């Protein structure tokens, strides 16, 4: 049995022949066809629409049963085309109606949601139209036109926005799923991390407090030692400095205080009573420090005795000033504080200058004051004793009998 090849030609092949054998862009150039040996298939033979079942059977004998005992069904061209057309037309009509209805519903849903949201918002804001006039109808028409344009756009670009909605929904679902899985892990990791942080922070704070306490103790110790050394060095320096320099420093301080009191007296500066008292206190303290360094006073007892001595002198002056003001019947106001300040300041200045010229005069003054007070008290005591003896002698003379007086007179 010889293999016969029946060339299959369709309307597409004829159209290709008429168009000068145009090349299919998907398949590429046509392969060479050798009709003698039949080894090469005709061009694009697998994509031919074979409508004749007889030719299909001739090319492939196994496609249909050619047994003589069995009568093959009659696949006529009319019967095949009629059946295929009926099935295809009925399925296409049903699918097109369903897809059109689905497309219309899905395109109308966004417009419906938009209008419902707008009505709810306007109702909440109490901005719905109450009286439909010209402007209201214009606004309503523009709104309807906008909704119609949106509906047409959704209808025309149905596939695009449906795909976008599907992709967005899938993405949101994945995000929610990932978030639901990831959040417990994050919470667990965060809780563990916070617990570790709290533990580490507590340990670190305890160590910091301990180190800070030790450091502060060392700082206080070093500061106390440094201050003691500074005071000692300053005291030795002041003790070794020339006496003229100390006098110049005190004179400068005296000039500053005099200028200050002069400004207060003139009225250019409105200082209160506390300023004068503080100035006097500063002068007294400065006098005490300088005099203590120059004497010098190195022990606490001598420092306290010198301070009490200066304060005692100031107290005596204050009592005398207050007593004199009270005797003259004047109120102790601004004038009294001013007088007291001047007296205290100049007293401190005089004592300082006197101490600088004659070192140890305060100590001798204390002894001299005690001796003078003792001498005054002794003189007063002697005077009282003499007065007492005089009164006692007068009383003895009054107690003599009259007879003895006559005898003494005769003798």
Curated annotation (Swiss-Prot):
InterPro entries recorded: WTF
Keyword Ribonucleoprotein among record annotations: no
Biased composition (Polar residues): 57-72
GO biological process: meiotic drive
Quaternary context: Homomer. Forms protein aggregates. The two isoforms can interact with each other and with themselves. High sequence similarity is required for their interaction.
Job of this protein: Promotes unequal transmission of alleles from the parental zygote to progeny spores by acting as poison/antidote system where the poison and antidote proteins are produced from the same locus; the poison component is trans-acting and targets all spores within an ascus whereas the antidote component is spore-specific, leading to poisoning of all progeny that do not inherit the allele.
Protein name: Meiotic driver wtf33
Originating organism: Schizosaccharomyces kambucha
Encoding gene per record: wtf33
């Amino acid at each position: 049995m010889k293999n016969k090849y029946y060339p299959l030609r369709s309307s597409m092949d004829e159209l290709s022949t008429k168009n000068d054998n145009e090349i299919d862009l998907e398949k590429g150039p046509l392969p060479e066809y050798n009709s003698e040996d039949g080894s090469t298939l005709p061009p694009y033979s697998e994509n031919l629409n074979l409508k004749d079942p007889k030719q299909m059977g001739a090319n492939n004998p196994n496609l249909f049963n050619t047994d003589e005992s069995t009568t093959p069904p009659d696949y006529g061209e009319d019967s095949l085309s009629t059946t295929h057309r009926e099935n295809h037309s009925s399925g296409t009509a049903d699918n097109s109606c369903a897809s059109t209805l689905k497309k219309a519903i899905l395109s109308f849903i966004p417009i419906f949601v938009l209008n419902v949201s707008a009505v709810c918002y306007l109702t909440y804001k109490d901005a719905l139209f109450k009286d439909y006039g010209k402007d209201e109808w214009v606004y309503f028409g523009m709104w309807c036109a906008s909704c119609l344009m949106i509906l047409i756009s959704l209808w025309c670009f149905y596939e695009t926005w449906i795909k976008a909605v599907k992709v967005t929904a899938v993405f949101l679902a994945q995000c929610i799923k990932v978030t639901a899985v990831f959040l417990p892990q994050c919470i667990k990791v965060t809780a563990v991390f916070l617990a570790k942080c709290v533990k580490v922070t507590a340990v670190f704070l305890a160590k910091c407090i301990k180190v800070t306490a030790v450091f502060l103790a060392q700082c206080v110790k070093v500061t106390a030692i440094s201050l003691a050394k500074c005071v000692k060095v300053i005291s030795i320096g002041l003790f070794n400095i020339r006496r003229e320099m100390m006098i110049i420093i005190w004179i400068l301080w005296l000039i500053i205080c005099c200028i200050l009191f002069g400004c207060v007296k003139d009225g250019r500066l409105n200082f209160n009573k506390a300023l004068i008292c503080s100035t006097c206190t500063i002068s007294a303290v400065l006098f005490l420090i300088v005099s203590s360094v120059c004497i010098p006073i190195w022990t606490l007892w001598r420092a306290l005795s010198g301070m009490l001595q200066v304060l005692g002198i100031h107290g005596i002056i204050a009592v005398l000033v207050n007593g004199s003001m009270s005797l003259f019947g004047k109120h102790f106001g601004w004038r009294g504080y001013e007088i007291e300040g001047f007296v205290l300041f100049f007293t401190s200045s005089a004592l300082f200058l006197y101490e600088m010229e004659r070192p140890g005069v305060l100590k001798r003054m204390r002894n001299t004051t005690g001796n003078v007070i003792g001498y005054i008290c002794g003189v007063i005591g002697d005077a009282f004793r003499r007065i007492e003896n005089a009164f006692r002698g007068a009383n003895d003379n009054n107690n003599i009998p009259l007879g003895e007086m006559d005898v003494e007179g005769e003798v």
